Amino acid sequence: MYKVMKFKSIIAATLIGSTLFTTSCKDDFADLNTNPSNISKPNVSYLFTDGLLKFESAGYLLWFYNGRYTSQFVQAYVPTGGLTGTFNQMGAAGGQGSQALQVLKLAREVDDILKYMDPKEAAKYEHIRVMFKPLLVYLGMFDTDVYGDMPYTEAAMAPYTSPMLLTPKYDSVAELYNIWLSELDETINVLSKPVVVGSETIPQTSLGSQDFLYKGDATKWAKLANSIKLKIAVRLLHQDKAKAIKIAEEVANSPVGVINGFNDDFILNKGVMNFHFGDDVSAYGAPTKQVVDFLIENRDPRVRFFYTKNDFNSKVVQAFFDAGRDLPAYIAENVEFEVVNGKKVFKSWKGVGEPWVRYYGLPNEIDAAQKGEYLDYFTTQRWKISLPGTTEKTFYPYSTFNQEMVRGQFDYTIPTVPGGPVIEDKEDRPWYGMFLSTAEVNLYFAEFSLLGANLPKTAEEYYNIAVERSVLEYDKLASLNKIPYYGTTYAYDDNESVIDLKDGEIANLKAKADYKFSGTTAEKLEKVYIQQYLHFMYQPTDQFVTVRRSGVPKVNSSLIAWQPIIESTNIPRRFEISLPDETDLMFDIKTASLKSQGFTGGQGITPSLLNTERVWQDKGAPNFGAGPNF
């Protein structure tokens, strides 16, 4: 008995509309159901592949809206025009709040198909059935991190209920964490043991290339499920520390293991022609000066993968000399020149040289663009030059968000002097995104070890593995996504260097005082959180959650210091949730959900309310910049 998809199309809009969180720029759900003429018999393997395709926690709207907010709230990025006094005010949002629903609809369809199969036939798909669950839990956490309670246990059930369930209840985050832990445990159990019906062992349907993450490898999916439990555990620390530690110990001692190495990492590519998205997200901005300075001071190779080089290669520097224009002071400090016949001639880069001298952040201060000491960072006219017979060109002295780390269709133009050649990198590359990795798992283990968990390795061992793996993982992503200057200098400037990871760099990095696992327990814990903060530079919600629950970066730190640009109590810790319309079938349920969480609904909410009205998992956590309070 297979239901016709057309029936589901009729009710889908009502169901989905009743479960959205976000206030505007909501995802378009109109095309989520397949034309019934294209389906004669549902295919379970296809539905799983479709679920993997619809897995998305790093889409265009996230980078354009939600991620941009959180990255500024946690002082990782600033707008290229500088911060203003309204940076803490919420506006349009998107890319988050209903992402789990996209995959849940397909999981529900699979459950329904299997329900009407012969038990032995249905058992052939047990692995596929449970492989949906790690995806759902991951996206569910992603949605609830900034919006709180959501429909889950009754969501997307309308096509399979009579009367149709059009008003799903909101499950609390506390309930969801328990549900998700149970679902992950079920996944681990099913994937690590034979599937048996009666006394007969049932062979499992092979996904092969239809699973473009792990090729249907049950052991890897079990590791993923086990590793995701750590993401729940760290979010539980301020509500039930003992339970969180117990979960971490169970994960570490589970016979299925955890993500360990490139072959296990949740690095997703959806196809050779899947470029993720093509829209510009340059508005994400530039890195903050304090973060870039920390990375450069410690020669952290990730600075080259996180951010773009600025436009001031040695030929551009020489063009500024030829035009009689001053270089930005912070760039001039790194230039060695000589005077020949009364003219400045570029000689070499000072200090550590290329590529390090090409990375600069912007000051993280309110209205910095209006302050005289920062003219070299924000006054565009200072970066414009022309040479005789050429058109004026602008050269940007700071680094920016590296768009090719999030989208494969991006054309990069190499900075050349006025009148110089036009050199472009226009190759489209299939996009690879990192969602959970060996580094993240080991950073969580290091944290839990310092908090008292009894784990197989020491906190130092986990920490050192994490630092090394994070660098290797970002180097791999940079290579896979072929970001500018990876593997090529474009043969323009003889003083240009590639950004590829070099032998010995990781060992040198781990020897730096700021990266060594040394000091008091509190100092070690801060280092773990700083590494989480850096590792999540391209997972903005995880970065936000880390800062929110740890209070790191913290004020007056000798590592990366929190800048007290405004009172921390005026920085949002959750996102706005729109008030339901009285005609909404879910009006009473949504209103009750807001009330039960203590949330003020609507738009234009005072930032201080978004700070004090916290999602459940955030209650009791330190304020921004205050440091850990365990």
Write out the residue ranges for each language-model feature:
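Structured, solvent-exposed acidic/aromatic patches
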Residues: 42, 76-135, 139-473, 521-523, ...
